[in-house]
Amino acid sequence: MKPAAAALLILSTLCMAQDKQPPATLRSLLLQELHTTHNKADWFVPINVAVDGLTAQQASWQPPAGSHSAGQLAYHLLFWNRRVLQRLKGESQEKYSGKNDDTFNNFDDKQWADVVKQLDEVMKEYEKLVESASDQQLASWGATIGTICTHNAYHIGQIVYVRKLQGSWNPEKGVK
């Protein structure tokens, strides 16, 4: 092999080795999922972007055919995220009727600003919980947190869709 070709082969191997990232851990994967559904735009819009600039009146608007409003969807996310977080932390949970409709229908536009603030706080608490959890706790909680993130992404998409129907969505925020 010619010296130049050998040097190029060694150099490319060294460059590839430097670009190699450490393998993902359960903690890093869960944090990535939490961040992308909370406040870091990636393949889809996170909740903080989906509700940004939405007024209480806009949050209460319901599309035809009985679909949920953006406010009802955000309230539902707050309810389930808070409830599961309380369970993971070993805290007592608020009373639940067992009727999932209640997790949407108890929304009141007067509480819109509080719903947005509390949802942001709950998402931050999840992130802190995952950052400080033991490996054993993460192994136990991983599937539940992953499911919560999937649930969040699903309803965030609905919020964006409702806003598009309403005409209150700014496509510059990530979804054209």
Segments predicted by a language model, with ranges:
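Cleaved targeting-peptide boundary
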Residues: 18-26
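Amphipathic, well-packed alpha-helical segments that form the structural scaffold of globular domains
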Residues: 48, 52-56, 124-127, 131
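Sec-dependent signal peptide recognition
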Residues: 1-7
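A structural signal for well-ordered alpha-helical scaffolds and beta->alpha junctions
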Residues: 27, 40, 44, 81, ...
